[in-house]
Amino acid sequence: MEKMNYLLPEESGEMTLSGITTLRKMEQKLRNLFESQNYQEVMPPNFESVELYTGLDAGFEQEKMFQFINHEGKSIALRYDFTVPLARNFALSELKEARYSYFGKVFRKEKRHKGRRTESYQVGTELLGLSEVTGDQEILGLTFMTLEALTLKNTIVEIGSAAFFKRLCELSGGDAPLFSELLEKKSLSGMKAFVDKHEMRGAPRDLLLALMTTTDLPTMKKLVLATGDEKLSQALEMLEALNLPDKTAICQIHYDFAMVPAMGYYTGLMFQVYVEGVAQAVISGGRYDKLLKQFGKTTGSIGFCVHMENVMKGLNND
């Protein structure tokens, strides 16, 4: 008889008893906060049709999905994302506006030693039906309240724009994949080689070389203005309309003009929250208006997700 292997598979996530106690306390704090702000808790299914994810122009990677064939011969996936099923539910409803919150796991195949778990626990909110600036301000305000509830110290909120990023890709000389990779890696030497390769001169060259080092809006506005590109200017105007301070009582606020969308469906504001001592973001969010449009509903939509395992790491570092 073969000896049983009692080791957990690497895809699994396990937590200590003390960790579970802390997690449940954090959950309750966030539940109370979201309820106080009129965000209704919902519980999407654990299983979804693979087609729900692959049929959208959202940048999902099918090879990262846990898939199986059900008794009807249809391809089913473990929940890959919360936003898509909630966007679908809202689009199919008669509601003009909705505020949702959720608590649960998502499942994505990740490469080993990348600092990401295949099985990850998320808490999040979705705000659907509000105009861009109004919705962005509400979600950012709720993000700040979430940080306060989690009692995380030394946090930085990084602000970016998917519209800004996508326009930069259009201007990248037909080499958008490499350009995006350089931004994601924050490779200054790589960007220098990139602009040399494409023989960029003047204002466009200055802009690309400054993307990774410029963290304030006025400086970036001057660089963009010099290029004369209207779409880039419009993207920055949307960020400026948020009227964000440099810091709040609980966090610093920086602009990351080299930010690459974490999700393919982001269209406008996007943000990442980092805490000292944790490599991955503890909160990530963004605007996804075009995702709703694919479900036949034209309105504003934005949300954020709290990565609870990363929050736990941050609390342990305090």
From Swiss-Prot:
GO MF annotation, one:
transferase activity
Q: Which GO terms describe its cellular component?
A: cytoplasm
Statement: the UniProt record of this protein carries the keyword Ribonucleoprotein: no
Q: InterPro entries, alphabetically?
A: aa-tRNA-synth_II, aa-tRNA-synth_II/BPL/LPL, HisRS-like_core, HisRS/HisZ, HisZ
Q: Where in the cell is it found?
A: Cytoplasm
Q: In what pathway does it function?
A: Amino-acid biosynthesis; L-histidine biosynthesis; L-histidine from 5-phospho-alpha-D-ribose 1-diphosphate: step 1/9
The answer to whether keyword Amino-acid biosynthesis applies is yes
Write the record's keywords in alphabetical order, separated by commas. Answer: Amino-acid biosynthesis, Cytoplasm, Histidine biosynthesis
UniProt-listed GO biological process terms: histidyl-tRNA aminoacylation; L-histidine biosynthetic process
Per the entry, what this protein does is:
Required for the first step of histidine biosynthesis. May allow the feedback regulation of ATP phosphoribosyltransferase activity by histidine.
The further comment given in this record reads:
This function is generally fulfilled by the C-terminal part of HisG, which is missing in some bacteria such as this one.
Its family remark reads: Belongs to the class-II aminoacyl-tRNA synthetase family. HisZ subfamily.
| Alphabetized PANTHER family for the sequence | ATP PHOSPHORIBOSYLTRANSFERASE REGULATORY SUBUNIT (PTHR43707:SF6), HISTIDYL-TRNA SYNTHETASE (PTHR43707)
- Assembly and interaction partners: Heteromultimer composed of HisG and HisZ subunits.
Q: What is this protein called?
A: ATP phosphoribosyltransferase regulatory subunit
Q: Which organism is it from?
A: Lactococcus lactis subsp. cremoris (strain SK11)
Read off the lineage from the record.
Bacteria, Bacillati, Bacillota, Bacilli, Lactobacillales
